[in-house]
A protein has these predicted regions:
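Hydrophobic, aromatic-rich transmembrane alpha-helices
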Residues: 144-154
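Membrane-helix boundary/juxtamembrane motif in polytopic membrane proteins
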Residues: 153-173
Length: 173
């Protein structure tokens, strides 16, 4: 029952990502959008399965796999917004953010510093934040706000025919 919504959302994201690749091809915007969609789809799909398992060992595996994807979501959104805004000078910051997410991924996989177990609720297992989790929250706040800011500034300064792409990207997030 509690897995229906994450499974549905997962399917929608996967469909969007594949649709864009099939219709737009492998462009910088299309690839970055598809990475965002596929990452979101697999994260939501993992949570849909997580809410159905009853084995703690399977639950911790799914939690770590799901969080591995969550770590890269803010950066993939930032990457997409950087491409939509046509800001190649931002790419080094995007790569830096991917690097930070990769470092956090090492801690996630190799220790309990990022996710320190799980809570068991009536609807299933859910991750328990570890000591390093606030770093991810801070990264999320910084890169999402930066992405929204550059998209807003690009839209504000764009020719009216080019501004529509930036405007349509903002409400999606």
């Amino acid at each position: 029952m509690y897995s229906i919504l994450p499974a549905l959302v997962s399917s929608v994201f996967l469909g969007y990502g594949l649709y864009v690749l099939c219709t737009q091809g492998f462009t910088r915007i299309g690839i970055s959008f598809s990475v965002l969609c596929v990452t979101s789809a697999f994260w939501q799909g993992t949570w849909a399965v997580l809410f159905q398992v009853h084995n703690p060992a399977v639950a911790i595996f799914l939690i770590k796999f799901g969080y591995l994807l969550i770590l890269f979501l803010p950066t993939s959104l930032y990457h997409f917004l950087t491409e939509v805004s046509d800001r190649p000078q931002e790419r080094h910051l995007v790569y830096l953010s991917y690097g930070l997410a990769s470092i956090l991924a090492v801690f996630l996989i190799g220790s309990d510093l990022f996710v320190s177990g799980y809570y068991e609720y009536f609807w299933g297992y859910y991750p328990k934040a570890g000591l390093l989790h606030p770093i991810h929250v801070l990264q999320t706040v910084v890169v999402v706000n930066r992405g929204l800011y550059i998209t807003y500034m690009q839209q504000r300064n764009a020719h009216p025919t080019n501004a529509s792409g930036c405007v349509s990207a903002l409400p999606a997030y």
